Amino acid sequence: MQIHVIKQGQSLWGISQLYSVPYPRLVDINALEQPGQLAMGQTLLVPTQNRYTVQQGDSFYSIASKTGVSILELRQANPQITGNVLYPGQVLRIPQKPKPTTLVNAFAEPYPKTVDYARTAAKALSWLSIFSYHVDAAGNLRPLEDETLLQVAKSNGVKPLLTITNIKEGADFDTELATTILTSEQVQNTLINNVLTTMNQKGYSGVNVDFEFLGIENKERYNQFLRKLVQKLRPQGYIVTTAVAPKTSADQKGVLYEGHDYQAHSKIVDYVIIMTYEWGWSGGPPLPVSPLPQVEEVLRYALTVIPKNKLIMGINLYGYDWTLPYVEGGPFAKALSIPQATRLAYTKQAEIQYDQEDEAPFYTYYDQNRKEHIVWFEDLRSYAAKFNLIKELGIAGMAFWNLAFPYPPLWILIQDRFQVKK
């Protein structure tokens, strides 16, 4: 598969002719609802069978990044090119090598559209983490209508994971609720029994524990709870994972970070999912949601205390649209799916740029009130860069938040670059 970046004046018909790929297949692979409306800088996935057609502005470095091979491998496969100059239209051979095996998890909430998106993604998934069973102060689980998502997972060979959270009813992740749970043996025992009963009754394959904003006072209490949970579930063959905040040191300050003990989790649970996104978030200044240098910094620290075969990178399926100038405490940025972001770029006649350092696409536009906006999001290039990092570090896999934001070409790209563990 080749990643093509739309240039000025290009049409899907012209791209189909350039690559000798049927027009309907390009529409299908990229799930294009309006194939005549392509934004400048938008990325498309093109089936090219181990060859790459050079685009304007390409270099050996950019082609290696897009295709997931090294510059050396690319040069060795194309000895006819002796210098560094490449010309648009040149066809390079892309060497084939065994695909690395990876775990792919996606979080999904049980809404009708999300169920449809889960069906689309299923072939590229190892796990489906159904979000979420809220835990109350007595250790009870708030009921969740998860039957349809469970059926989608099981019918596609995907292991469903039950996600439990300390989300307070009608609110968000709650420190006080977590403290109530983690300071009571009785509440914890009730919770563990409820988790086990629900998994047995519904056919879950494991649990993901997503307790957030714990504070330092709950760090060791949380570790102890996880030990008790694993002691109860592991003998029955259940997978146990945790979702943790992105840290670059063990003593990183802040209520979001201090309760998550990377090293302890790595010794207790089967896998640790690091939520490596939200540098750019809806209430903060405009930034890439998951800039690759910062993601890499977190993962490289994590690898000093977590075995690589237990470490999973979190990846966002969305971007944000900020109104400029950013004012602290002002209106929150609007979340967008990748198709929404590219459609908006087309509508506003904005050219999508690409930040090579952060490995993230962005663009600016003016709304009807002449207010400037900036949109940071993801595309096939930024995902390919993240996949290259996963391969380089040799970590266990990736976890996507969340399937409410559809992007069908992504699941095809994953299967092109990896052997998905089922």
Please annotate each region the language model reported.
Residues 1-19, 42-68, 90-92:
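Primarily a LysM-type cell-wall glycan-binding module
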Residues 96-190, 194:
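Glycan-recognition patch characteristic of GH18 chitinases/ENGases
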Residues 108-123, 185-200, 254-263, 378-389:
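Short, acidic/polar
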Residues 128, 209, 272, 313, ...:
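Conserved, mostly hydrophobic/aromatic
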Residues 129-132, 192-221, 271-285:
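Active-site groove signature of glycoside hydrolases
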Residues 137-142, 220-345:
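Substrate-binding surface in catalytic domains of secreted glycosidases
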Residues 163-178, 317-386, 418-422:
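Glycan-binding loop/region signatures in secreted carbohydrate-active enzymes
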Residues 386-422:
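Acidic/aromatic/glycine-rich contiguous surface patches that form carbohydrate-binding/processing clefts
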